[in-house]
């Protein structure tokens, strides 16, 4: 029995395993960066390829970070009410810093800052954290959970034949479900009634048949 043995060892020490999960989570978030002039741009945004066991192990950490960022979105929207459009260093910005609007903005922004610090503590990458809060979290506002999927790859990894898998965000590469068209029986019934109404009815035909039989 595997009592109190949650998780996978992955052939690493606890500190090495923790660093591995941090790097995988940051790598997935960083694929959503603006890589127009990046020489090492990701081939597909929102997707990384790793081993199957690593993907299963890092998925809960990715989901946890997204949930933390998503819960801070209402506070960020509340803080926008008291924000200023003035550039930093200008006289208007300095006046705003001394006003009560800045105090309200700082109070509304405090939960967002706490959430960002929590995610930085979990993954250790500030750039990935900013991408998570600015881009990824807004995508899953109406989704209660299940932000990622794992797709097994058919070809194993060269060298050790390890099972590979894709870890990606849902919503971008989803298959479109097409519903079959429902057959309409009302049109067929109406056409049959019209055909029966158009057929002529001859009352003398049965009488003629009976007379021929008597002969």
How does the language model describe each region?
Residues 196-215:
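Intrinsically disordered, low-complexity acidic/polar and Pro/Ser/Thr-rich regulatory regions
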Residues 2-8, 19, 31, 43-202:
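Structured, basic alpha/beta domains of bacterial-type, RNA-associated proteins
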Residues 27-28:
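Short alpha-helical functional segments enriched in proximate histidine and acidic residues
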């Amino acid at each position: 029995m595997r009592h109190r043995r949650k998780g996978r060892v992955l052939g690493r020490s606890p500190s090495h395993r923790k660093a591995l999960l941090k790097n995988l989570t940051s790598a997935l978030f960083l694929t959503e960066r603006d890589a127009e002039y990046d020489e090492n741009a990701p081939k597909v945004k929102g997707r990384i390829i790793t081993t199957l066991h690593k993907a299963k192990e890092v998925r809960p950490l990715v989901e946890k970070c997204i949930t933390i960022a998503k819960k801070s979105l209402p506070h960020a929207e509340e803080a926008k009410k008291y924000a200023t459009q003035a550039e930093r260093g200008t006289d208007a910005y300095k006046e705003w810093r001394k006003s009560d609007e800045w105090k309200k903005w700082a109070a509304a922004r405090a939960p967002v800052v706490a959430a960002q610090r929590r995610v930085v503590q979990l993954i250790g990458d500030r750039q990935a954290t900013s991408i998570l809060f600015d881009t990824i979290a807004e995508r899953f506002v109406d989704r209660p959970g299940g932000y990622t999927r794992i797709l097994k790859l058919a070809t194993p990894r060269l060298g050790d034949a390890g099972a590979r898998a894709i870890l990606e965000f849902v919503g971008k590469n989803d298959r479109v479900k097409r519903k079959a068209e429902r057959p309409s029986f009302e049109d067929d019934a109406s056409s049959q009634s019209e055909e029966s109404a158009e057929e002529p009815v001859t009352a003398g035909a049965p009488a003629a048949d009976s007379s021929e039989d008597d002969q």
